[in-house]
Amino acid sequence: MLERAPVVTVDGPSGAGKGTISQLLAEKLGYKLLDSGAIYRVLALAAIHHNVELDNEESLTLLAAHLDVQFITGNESKGIKVVLEGEDVSTTIRSQECSNAASKVAAFPRVREALLRRQRAFAEAPGLIADGRDMGTVVFPATPAKLFLTASAEERAQRRYNQLQDNGFDVKIDQLLSEIKERDDRDMNRSVAPLVPAEDALVIDTTNISIEDVLAMALTHIHKSFQVPA
């Protein structure tokens, strides 16, 4: 079944440039944006706000089904703004408390199913840019416009290192590289929704390509898929 509105999926590992490209595509095309990586953190924060116990699968499932969240493009350097029930929670959801809570709520099958339906509901006119890890393989498999961004582990570690350094964190690049390689191995070899490109996805290795060139390649692919102005 085709989606209700044009959907562009942007999958790939952390540090490949998904967030930046997704934001630029949303701005260029006037499409809405879905940051699926933040969904579980947002749900966890909503549960905390509404005093929902993190082991109450029924209440969490109901909350997930009606999750009032928006993802808004803005200043590229600041990234995507995450708005929960009218409140900017972009910083709050990155807290350790939200991270721990997100791991708990994600363990419930009914919660995951409710969030899957909630993510699909983002597909509304004029269109959607869906940023994630399994958008093209699980959430929106019917869309013809699928992108998969990747980059070498070394390049992604360097990007993450620069980002953390810019934000005042003292980190070691060797440790970041090790963590990235371990996560890649887990993600690519897990039994449920492994991190792999959809068969019909355009795979772009961003290691030695400028953001401008990646954006141009992505827009050309979208134009061919949907015949929308590139």
UniProtKB/Swiss-Prot annotation:
InterPro entries: Cytidylate_kin, Cytidylate_kinase_dom, P-loop_NTPase. It is an enzyme of class 2 (transferase). GO terms for molecular function: ATP binding; CMP kinase activity; dCMP kinase activity. Belongs to the cytidylate kinase family. Type 1 subfamily. ATP binds at G12, P13, S14, G15, A16, G17, K18, G19, T20. Keywords: ATP-binding, Cytoplasm, Kinase, Nucleotide-binding, Transferase. It comes from the Bacteria. GO terms for biological process: nucleobase-containing small molecule interconversion; pyrimidine nucleotide metabolic process. Pfam families: Cytidylate_kin (PF02224). One of its GO terms (cellular component) is cytosol. It comes from Shewanella piezotolerans (strain WP3 / JCM 13877). It is found in: Cytoplasm. This is Cytidylate kinase. It catalyses: CMP + ATP = CDP + ADP; dCMP + ATP = dCDP + ADP. Signal peptide: none annotated. The keyword Cell membrane does not apply.
